[in-house]
């Protein structure tokens, strides 16, 4: 846990320091550095940014029950950044664990799906300024916690000791952490199914590992249904941002400029309030 906190703090210090430098000069115009940038040139021709997302991460992104459209905090924020640049976004529904490779291969211009800025991912792609910081949380049915005599667990290894199988979406950071800790893990291709199976009484999973505000969203949804889900484990986590290919420096710089403007003028905090995401 100490290692996770240390790494997270280093990443936060780097990205926040960069953010402060940009926000100090808020009205930054779109840039086009010298040299060829095929991704940005194509975006300029089409006026469209191709973005991949997995819409099973409420309140970051989800399908509207009425319209079927992809909506959510990150969706609204990315759309606002694009509008700031005189562009629009075409949203592509794609599995979470396929987004980074699709961005690297040029099939998508950007990934927007609650991506944490981790050291491993920084080797593969570049990230915009962070829009949020999160906590990692493992949640359980309160009835299960009571039956096992659990109030709070302090390490991931405690779940192994207590014989608790933890569900998680495949391909994300939490899966790696659980496996490294020797915890019995069950994976799903989307982020909603682990939570739904947890409350349905599926005996193959007794807990789910995800980040706030995703965990908070599900806890509140289940509470509305009279189902008590509680946090059994929590720890500080990584900041969250949008990602682009390392060959997309112009898109990255321009999106950072747009995002800095939206932080400065209060749009980001307004959207967080709208989607019930803490502003700290």
Where are these regions (language model features)?
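Periplasmic-binding protein-like
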Residues: 55, 133-137, 212, 216-260, ...
